[in-house]
């Protein structure tokens, strides 16, 4: 069983001390991991579906990648670049590539690096592939979930302890929230979906019955107003 000690640079020294002293450490990725064989089986089972989504995305109407990227403004860009402090020849992993804002900023700071860009969103993966065309020696685009990271990295030939820094910017981005077709927008009308990778699994709508939605409104809004059932039925 393999464990990849991929640490965010800002915690690198502290986490190393914890490891040496045997103290459980929350920075190790992943904390729980299946055997390598299990990871490969899971990865191979989903890879074909993922690639089909990406091919369909590329065959769809022409997309302005720069416009798509501008939909989301990454947070704390200067702080991230300062924290990672990229140096010539180093290798990094961006586990939430999104529209690539952080990755671009890192490359602007130091272009002579290698950066693995992971995202489960086919749209984000398409953006990563587009960026890899501009930086063919620097960007390695990967499509998959966090749980698939080990299998993807092993397939790419990445050895344990390779990365000099890892970035995770967790949460949804404007690409999901401002695009009603994605089914996650709170600002615009659109189908209910809320999946990051819309081609996999059954739509969330299938599981959200009126009673469950009514309960959710009560729990999360902390009130039971008369119109809640009507809202859910709509």
From Swiss-Prot:
InterPro entries: RsmH (IPR002903), SAM-dep_MeTrfase_MraW_recog (IPR023397), SAM-dependent_MTases_sf (IPR029063). S-adenosyl-L-methionine binds at residues 100-102, 119, 146, 169, 176. One of its GO terms (molecular function) is rRNA (cytosine-N4-)-methyltransferase activity. One of its GO terms (biological process) is rRNA base methylation. Keywords: Methyltransferase, S-adenosyl-L-methionine, Transferase. Probable S-adenosyl-L-methionine-dependent methyltransferase. Belongs to the methyltransferase superfamily. RsmH family. This is Putative methyltransferase-like protein 15P1. It comes from Homo sapiens (Human).
């Amino acid at each position: 069983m393999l464990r990849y000690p991929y640490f965010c640079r800002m915690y690198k020294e502290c986490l190393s001390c914890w490891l040496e002293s045997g103290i459980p450490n929350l920075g190790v990725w992943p904390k729980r991991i299946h055997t390598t064989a299990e990871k490969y089986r899971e990865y191979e089972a989903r890879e074909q579906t993922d690639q089909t989504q990406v091919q369909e995305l590329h065959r769809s109407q022409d997309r302005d990648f720069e416009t798509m990227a501008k939909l989301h403004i990454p947070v704390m860009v200067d702080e991230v670049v300062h924290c990672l402090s990229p140096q010539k020849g180093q290798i990094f992993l961006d586990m939430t590539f999104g529209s690539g804002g952080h990755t671009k900023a890192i490359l602007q700071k130091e272009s002579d690096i290698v950066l693995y860009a992971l995202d489960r969103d086919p749209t984000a993966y398409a953006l990563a592939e587009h960026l890899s065309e501009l930086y063919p020696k620097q960007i390695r685009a990967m499509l998959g979930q966090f749980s698939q990271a080990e299998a993807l990295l092993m397939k790419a030939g990445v050895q344990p302890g390779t990365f000099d820094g890892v970035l995770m910017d967790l949460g949804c981005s404007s690409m999901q929230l401002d695009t009603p077709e994605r089914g996650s927008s709170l600002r615009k009308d659109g189908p209910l979906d809320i999946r990051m990778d819309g081609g996999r699994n059954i739509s969330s709508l299938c599981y959200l019955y009126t009673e469950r939605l009514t309960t959710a409104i009560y729990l999360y809004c902390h009130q039971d107003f008369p119109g809640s059932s009507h809202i859910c039925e709509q």
